[in-house]
Design a protein with these regions (language model features):
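Secretory/organelle targeting and membrane-embedding segments
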Residues: 165-343, 347-360
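N-terminal non-catalytic accessory region
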Residues: 1-146, 150-206, 311-315, 324-483
Length: 483
């Protein structure tokens, strides 16, 4: 079936990427500022000057298309697959991508790039202006918004605060928080440890980005405002908005207060039919215990993880309370928009499978599963430790001890800047073994290939509870910088 064919062009689709998912460039020189890793590696002495242009505000920066060419590591925030895979999937399904003149009988898809640094109010307003231009091109047809992460936030702002409910018929929100992510506070407090690839750390890339992020109004708008996720060592709730001395400057604290105000203004109203696709069963930062020093200053935070999320956004925040349809998948925040199971559901919904009543699809409801590797980056030849925990949660939680788990390392793509790299001849495969001391926990190890690149660590889980389940975790193989 070709989903993009339509007897009438009664709507068009807009892809709204998430945080850091749009390219940014200098308006005057047209130089890509975010992010051209090959260019940075060719001229590392220029990295600091290039990145400084990202400091907000800087009106000489403009969006220049969506991230559509390579995987982006921004740890500990997320491992982001590129949106080109989503666009190509829709093209293969018969949709028309970014047409100058729409073809009758074809449903058009428009990727929307925006400056993700700026206040999400402004991004939502600009999205509205562009959607209305596209409506004119389509004789008044309404938009269907497919939005990932922060893209869902600006989509909701457009719909609820900029009159967009007259322009939008459906919203499809993928891993998009309505009540932020604790990881935003973790990044603001501790910074990034890897951005792009490890080699860039030699030039202070991660530290520079960590400094710049504190100047972005939008990042403070990703902080949870309803869920009290922080406590002191005395188990007292810690209000990070009232006690804002964890931030270094008065400007940072003003941005924090405006982030709170933004979310209070946006609220939880949904004026158009909304579908939530969300990830679960991934180790996700959901809470933190803060050690306080003199004057209530934060000394350190012990972050707590559970499987109730996609690795970045807690499940509670990714499931909008007013959404009519909700679909859960065992996926990461950074690949929810390209995962095969999610795309199958999206195809169904875009083909007209939407219901008017509340509809919920939940996978793994009777299976507690956690699959992970011990690191995100490995050197060639290094041992990759893999584990998976399985529990039957009906009627009560019991470890599953008779499962079979087959794990393989599947080539995904070269590291940024190494586009000529080719996949290894035979990636490793193993079967995980039951841990004799931990019922329900399966462990194993394999050797990272000598070929640098990005790989999917893929596990096929065989249990008696349901049909075979495939889960993945993305890792990178890269030599130690300077080694």
């Amino acid at each position: 079936m070709v989903f993009g064919d339509s007897s009438s062009s009664d709507h068009f689709i807009v892809i709204v990427p998430g945080y850091m998912g749009s390219l940014l460039r200098d308006k005057n020189t047209k130089e890509t500022i975010w992010i051209d890793i090959p260019a940075m590696l060719r001229n590392p002495a220029h990295i600091d000057d290039t990145l400084e242009k990202l400091r907000y505000p800087n009106e000489d920066i403009e969006p220049a298309g969506i991230m559509d060419k390579s995987v982006l590591y921004v740890l500990p925030w997320a491992k982001l697959d590129h949106y080109g895979r989503l666009i190509e999937h829709l093209r293969e399904e018969g949709f028309e991508i970014n047409p100058e003149t729409p073809t009758p009988g074809k449903t058009a898809v428009y990727p929307y790039a925006y400056d993700w640094r700026q206040d999400n109010r402004l991004s939502g307003r600009q999205l509205g202006e562009t959607v209305r231009d596209w409506r004119q091109k389509h004789n008044g047809a309404k938009a269907w918004l497919v939005a990932h992460s922060n893209g869902g936030i600006i989509s909701r702002w457009f719909v609820e605060k900029e009159g967009g409910k007259e322009d939008v018929e459906h919203m499809f929100l993928m891993g998009s928080p309505w009540d932020g992510s604790p990881k935003s506070v973790r990044v603001l407090f501790e910074g990034y440890n890897i951005v792009g690839r490890r080699l860039l750390n030699l030039f202070g890339f991660n530290k520079k980005i960590s400094s710049l992020i504190r100047s972005f109004p939008s990042f403070y708008q990703l902080i949870p405002y309803q869920n009290p996720f922080l406590r002191t060592e005395d188990n007292e709730v810690l209000d990070l908005f009232t006690n804002a001395n964890w931030l270094e400057s008065e400007q940072d604290r003003q941005l924090l207060q405006d982030g709170l105000k933004f979310n209070q203004e946006l609220g939880t109203t949904l004026s158009v039919h909304t579908v939530c696709y969300f990830g679960r069963k991934k180790p996700t930062t959901t809470a933190g215990v803060v050690s306080l020093g003199v004057g209530g200053k934060w000394k350190e935070v012990r972050w707590l993880e559970t499987g109730a999320g996609d690795g970045t956004i807690p499940e509670r925040s990714a499931v909008h309370p007013q959404a009519k349809e909700r679909h859960a998948f065992a996926v990461d925040h950074g690949n929810i928009y390209v995962h095969e199971d999610v795309l199958t559901q999206l195809d169904f919904d875009l083909a007209g499978g939407l219901g008017g009543l509340e509809f919920v699809t939940v996978t793994l409801d009777n299976l507690s599963l956690e699959f992970d590797a011990n690191e995100d980056f490995y050197t060639p030849g290094e041992t990759v430790q893999v584990y998976c925990t399985l529990k039957d949660t009906t009627p009560e939680t019991n470890p599953i001890t008779d499962a079979r788990l087959e794990v393989s390392l599947v080539w995904k793509e070269p590291l940024p800047g190494d586009e000529d790299a080719s996949p290894p001849v035979q990636p490793p495969e193993i079967s995980l073994k039951q841990d004799a001391n931990e019922p329900g926990t399966y462990r194993g190890s394999l050797t990272a290939p000598m070929q640098e690149g990005t790989y999917n660590l893929r596990a096929v889980v065989h249990t008696n509870l349901q049909s075979d389940l495939t889960v993945e975790e993305m890792i990178a193989v890269e030599a130690e910088p300077g080694g």
